[in-house]
């Protein structure tokens, strides 16, 4: 299964939602290693020394979409989710992209 995460908070928040996101991804990667974990973020960061697990990958906006990370997260991340083959998507910060309905992925906040 390919599990996708809105990982902005994972990479840029040192506490609260960032801790929740890092713990969730780290523990799932460790205890469910057969899954693939896809981390969607407007840009890569390195908050708190988080190391991306071997069974995880990072997706960032490309081209013109990279100009506005917040617009990408809200209105274009669904396309990236679809192209990445995500089966289930978790909006870690209690948000889902507006275009999540255009994907085949199940979603949860």
Regions found by a protein language model. Give the residues of each.
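Carbohydrate transferase catalytic cores enriched for Leloir-type hexosyltransferases
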Residues: 1-109
